[in-house]
A protein has these predicted regions:
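Key DNA-contacting residues within the recognition helix of helix-turn-helix
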Residues: 140-141
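Short alpha-helical "recognition helix" segments of helix-turn-helix
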Residues: 124-132
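Flexible, glycine/charge-rich interdomain/linker segments that couple
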Residues: 74-98, 102
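Short alpha-helical "packing" element that flanks the helix-turn-helix/winged-helix DNA-binding module
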Residues: 113-118, 128
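Short helix-coil-helix linker/hinge
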Residues: 104-112, 122
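DNA-contacting interfaces and partner/effector-binding or oligomerization modules
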Residues: 1-71
Length: 183
C-alpha cells in the first residue's frame, strides 16, 4: 500500500473577500499540519486564512485534492476544507470540518488563547494557568465552556478519516485482523 501524501493550500481572507489562488503550505506530519491549521485559526491577532487539505497516494493527487478542498471551502463560505478523492470520507470530512470550524469560531479570545496552549502546544491545564497567571479553576472553566474536548474529538476524527482505514481492514478479509479470526 502506498504511503499517505498530504498537501495543504492556504489563502488569506480579507474583509473585501477572498484572495483566490493561495499558497502551498509546507506539510510535515498530519498532526503538525492540523496543529498549524488550528493554531492559525486560534490566532485572533494575525490574518485569517482559508485552508484546503488534500490527501492522496502521491504528491500530484494530494495537491489536486488540496485545490478541490480550498475551492469547495471558498464556495461554501468556510475557512476549512478537506478532500481525499473518496466520496464517503469526503462527505464525513465536510461535516466534521463544519463542526470543527464552528467550535473554533465560537471561542472567546481568552478561550482561544487557552485552546492554543492546550490543543496545539500540548500544555497541561496547570501549566497554562501558571503561564497566564490565573487559577487552574479559571483554565478548567475555559476548557469546559470552550468545549475543548469536543474540538479535540473532531480533530482526531478528521485525522483518522484523512489517513483512511487501517491496512487490516483493507486486507484482513471481513474487516477482522487475521489473528482475531476463529480457526
Amino acid at each position: 500500500m502506498d504511503a499517505l501524501r498530504l498537501a495543504a493550500l492556504a489563502e488569506p481572507v480579507t474583509t473585501t473577500g477572498p484572495s483566490p489562488g493561495g499558497m502551498t503550505a509546507r506539510v510535515g506530519t498530519l498532526p503538525d499540519l492540523l496543529d498549524r491549521v488550528i493554531g492559525s485559526r486560534l490566532d485572533r491577532v494575525g490574518a485569517a486564512f482559508r485552508w484546503g487539505i488534500g490527501a492522496g497516494h502521491d504528491s500530484a493527487s494530494a495537491e489536486a485534492h488540496a485545490a478541490i478542498a480550498i475551492r469547495t471551502a471558498r464556495d461554501r463560505g468556510s475557512w476549512l476544507g478537506f478532500a481525499t478523492g473518496d466520496p464517503w470520507r469526503d462527505a464525513l470530512l465536510a461535516d466534521l470540518g463544519v463542526a470543527l470550524a464552528a467550535l473554533l469560531d465560537d471561542l472567546t479570545p481568552r478561550q482561544a488563547e487557552i485552546a492554543g496552549r492546550v490543543l496545539v502546544d500540548g500544555a497541561r491545564q496547570a501549566e497554562v494557568a501558571a503561564a497566564l497567571g490565573v487559577s487552574r479553576a479559571t483554565v478548567s472553566v475555559a476548557v469546559a465552556r470552550g468545549r475543548l474536548p469536543a474540538i479535540a474529538s473532531a480533530r482526531r476524527a478528521i485525522e483518522a478519516l484523512l489517513v483512511g482505514p487501517p491496512p487490516v481492514a483493507l486486507g484482513g478479509g471481513e474487516g477482522v485482523a487475521p489473528a482475531a479470526r476463529p480457526r
